[in-house]
């Protein structure tokens, strides 16, 4: 599926149907050094989160995805290490690969409590190792949600700490053949890291090729004035995209004129 075909279908509300809020847009799944040089064309690879496609079983959902040209699968990270064999078997012989892994860790990296940070590090590394076994492009993480307290203050020192810890995680992810993917959220969900540009600058400062970032049209609607500017600012660190309708966070195209993604896709192209 190419960019023009996807945009035409979603903008008239006739995109690939789904039973859950999100479908996803993913960059090429094998590891690379970024989206390529400006002016180069990049393939559009659609990916669904695990429960997006209709079906009672995983096999039925994967059948649906294949029938509609969806070539990526984004499972959750919780208990992922115990599911590696199951997922490999389910994907065997299919034109579907694991794209990103959606979080699933315990604790959080910016907790003021050492034991909570240690729990995050332990469980995140378990997920990263499983992601590598599955050939995933990376594990999505958020530094802290609004409900997670006590949390480190929003200071330059906290940013320095985050950069240092992500460098270690990123280097470990590279050893496992995958990456860590930072996801900016809107201010109603997270006080820290709300724009793609900020995520990209953190990726840069880690100095690790195992730390990348992503954009999400839903969060960008609240936090950025330009989709083009937001995604272009991600540069070579941008690895994955989430897309949803911009008014109700459902299927792209369901909210009429609000669901205009053209500027964002221009940046991705």
List PLM regions with ranges:
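Histidine-acidic metal/acid-base catalytic patches
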Residues: 2-50, 54-69, 135-137, 193-215, ...
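Active-site acidic/histidine proton-transfer and metal-coordination neighborhood
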Residues: 8-22, 35-38, 110, 114-212, ...
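Active-site-proximal loop/turn and secondary-structure-junction residues that shape catalytic pockets
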Residues: 52-54, 79, 104-107, 145-147, ...
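N-terminal substrate-binding region of glycoside hydrolase catalytic domains
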Residues: 64-82, 102-107
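Glycine-rich, proline-tolerant flexible connector loops at the mouths of alpha/beta enzymes
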Residues: 75-92, 143-150
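Short amphipathic alpha-helices and their capping/turn segments at secondary-structure boundaries
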Residues: 82-95, 123-135, 163-171, 226-233, ...
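Mid-chain, structured segments of secreted extracytoplasmic proteins
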Residues: 91-115
